[in-house]
């Protein structure tokens, strides 16, 4: 009985995390224009390091352990982030769109090869 409840709890937790991630992406319009994605990236660069520091300080206070000071993350500049992002998305989507026809073509070639060499 406990195993079933634990399994259900794990499923609900994973589903909640996945649903929250989908909601966040939709709410922040990260799949929309590149300007929104760039703004979200800049916001994350500003917010995440202080939050990690505060969380590590909280853990140290609660547990009595001392964590070593982490090095500061390097500053990464994305001058043409928009172009790279868009070209990556276009490449992936075009590959996905031709995948069924390519799979059919390759399977046909493979079948012909097997027929030739099995004689």
UniProtKB/Swiss-Prot annotation:
Q: How does it sit in the membrane?
A: Single-pass membrane protein
Positions on the Mitochondrial intermembrane side per record topology: 27-119
Q: Which residues form the signal peptide?
A: none
State the source organism's domain of life: Eukaryota
A cellular component annotation (GO) from this entry: mitochondrial crista junction
What subcellular compartments does it reside in?
A: Mitochondrion inner membrane
Please name the Pfam families in this protein's record: QIL1
| Keywords annotated in UniProt | Membrane, Mitochondrion, Mitochondrion inner membrane, Transmembrane, Transmembrane helix
- Asked if the Swiss-Prot or TrEMBL record annotates the protein with the keyword Transmembrane, the reply is yes
InterPro entries, per the entry? Mic13
Keyword Membrane in the entry? The reply is yes
Subunit and interaction comment = Component of the mitochondrial contact site and cristae organizing system (MICOS) complex, composed of at least MICOS10/MIC10, CHCHD3/MIC19, CHCHD6/MIC25, APOO/MIC26, MICOS13/MIC13, APOOL/MIC27 and IMMT/MIC60. The MICOS complex associates with mitochondrial outer membrane proteins SAMM50, MTX1 and MTX2 (together described as components of the mitochondrial outer membrane sorting assembly machinery (SAM) complex) and DNAJC11, mitochondrial inner membrane protein TMEM11 and with HSPA9.
Record's protein name: MICOS complex subunit MIC13
Provide the taxonomic classification: Eukaryota, Metazoa, Chordata, Craniata, Vertebrata
């Amino acid at each position: 009985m406990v195993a079933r409840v634990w399994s259900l709890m794990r499923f609900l937790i994973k589903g909640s995390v996945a649903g929250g991630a989908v909601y966040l992406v939709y709410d922040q319009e990260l799949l929309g224009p590149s300007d929104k994605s760039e703004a979200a990236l800049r916001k994350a660069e500003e917010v995440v390091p202080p939050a990690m520091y505060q969380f590590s300080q909280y853990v140290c206070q609660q547990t009595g352990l001392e964590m070593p000071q982490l090095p500061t993350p390097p500053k990464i500049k994305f001058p043409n982030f928009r172009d790279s992002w868009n070209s990556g998305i276009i490449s992936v989507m075009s590959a996905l769109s031709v995948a069924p026809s390519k799979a059919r073509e390759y399977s046909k070639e493979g079948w012909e090869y097997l027929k030739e060499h099995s004689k």
